[in-house]
Amino acid sequence: TCKSQSPIMNHISLFTDENGNLDIDRSAQNWIDLGNLFAMLGVGFHSMYCARPTGEHHYFTRPLADINKVFNKVYRSLASINRPSRYITMTSSAGKISMLGTVELQGEKLFALKFNEARNMEWMDKVYLARYDERQNTIANLVPYGADKHFYEDELHEIENMLHDSIESTRHQQ
């Protein structure tokens, strides 16, 4: 089986209206057409993912809130056999994170997030919350809900320091 992973990219697969705002309907229709084309070709529509936060990320991305609106419209418009996997994903230093959607807790709108892949396998499938932000375009930069930092941040810092030390040690041995 052939499967497709497709990046959600501004200026390529997302369209803006005359005011520069994301055109949710037109952008979603672009993805719906792609999903139907994949089905006709026998290609599985595996996933839609956000551009990695590297290089020209600011040019190719849109706010996560907008991307979530497009994804939800695509997901609800395609036949089940033509749909992408259930969630939008984005890679971060901590791992591959899915945006499950939004929830409201005590009157506050939040993003629900989950690790699909992680630097520490104990983080896998763990759901956590971050404050809803209409402008943020990177999952790793979302503000944690109910805490000063995300549950994984201290351990991630330790992992990254160990990796750095290991690389430096290897360099000095050569």
Predicted regions and their residues:
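Conserved strand-turn element in the central/C-terminal portion of the radical SAM core barrel
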Residues: 1-30, 44-60, 90-91
